[in-house]
């Protein structure tokens, strides 16, 4: 089994809100496109510092991150990011570390996407191929 990567479009969610309120021109919204690693072992989304800077995101807090090798580190947490993968959109904060964008479990669950290990790609949940479904019970 090899790694799974996907195109992800990230947008500053605060910028989007300012556009909706007429306080920012649409062409001023900060966006970033990445070839992201999909990691089902990562719970949260991860963005590196250069992406935080490109999107103009504020660091709103800190979280304790535990790496696969057992090391732990305090890392920054961003304000909300609009995340679009395969036309499906959600909002989430991200941990700030490393040098590449990583899509973790929470984003996959919110977007109702599955990892197809055989073909090394993301696929929509076969039960909900047209749009994500969020369980509320």
Where is each model-derived feature located?
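Pepsin/retropepsin-fold aspartyl endopeptidases
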Residues: 1-137
């Amino acid at each position: 089994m090899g790694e799974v990567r996907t195109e992800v479009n990230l947008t500053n969610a605060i910028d989007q809100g300012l556009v909706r309120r007429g306080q920012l021109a649409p062409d001023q919204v900060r966006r970033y496109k990445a070839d992201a690693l999909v990691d089902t072992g990562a719970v949260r989304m991860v963005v590196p510092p250069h992406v935080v800077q490109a999107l103009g995101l504020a660091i709103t807090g800190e979280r304790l991150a535990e790496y696969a090798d057992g090391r732990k580190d305090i890392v920054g947490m961003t304000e909300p990011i609009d995340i679009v993968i395969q036309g499906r959109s959600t909002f989430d904060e991200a941990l700030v570390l490393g040098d590449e964008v990583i899509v973790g479990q929470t984003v996959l669950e919110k977007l109702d996407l599955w990892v197809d290990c055989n073909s090394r790609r993301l696929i929509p949940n076969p039960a909900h191929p047209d749009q994500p479904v969020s369980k509320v019970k």
